[in-house]
Amino acid sequence: MELTPREKDKLLIFTAALLAERRKARGLKLNYPEAVALITAAIMEGARDGRTVAELMHEGTTVLTREDVMDGIAEMIPEIQVEATFPDGTKLVTVHHPIV
């Protein structure tokens, strides 16, 4: 199987998000890479499902709360930008203050 660098990146994000999801389900607080991966994967999947950029900008703020992450992590992530593939092409989704 041959994958482009972009496809490899998507697979890596998905794998990290899956790990983060499992750790969160066990009650563990997420670290920086886990939090970013989980939010990023949610945005990418939402785009694939056909949601709009505006919907995903809002949805990105509902994936995690401060209680889900280690101390100081929310402040380390002022925004997340994701180039997501929508049915009509690739668009940049920016989520400001993703962890409230």
Curated annotation (Swiss-Prot):
PANTHER family: UREASE (PTHR33569:SF1). The keyword Acyltransferase does not apply. It comes from Cupriavidus taiwanensis (strain DSM 17343 / BCRC 17206 / CCUG 44338 / CIP 107171 / LMG 19424 / R1). This is Urease subunit gamma. SUPFAM superfamilies: Urease, gamma-subunit (SSF54111). Heterotrimer of UreA (gamma), UreB (beta) and UreC (alpha) subunits. Three heterotrimers associate to form the active enzyme. GO terms for molecular function: nickel cation binding; urease activity. It catalyses: urea + 2 H2O + H(+) = hydrogencarbonate + 2 NH4(+). Its EC number is 3.5.1.5. Its main location: cytoplasm. Belongs to the urease gamma subunit family. GO terms for cellular component: cytoplasm. It holds the Pfam family Urease_gamma. It is found in: Cytoplasm. Pathway: Nitrogen metabolism; urea degradation; CO(2) and NH(3) from urea (urease route): step 1/1. Keywords: Cytoplasm, Hydrolase.
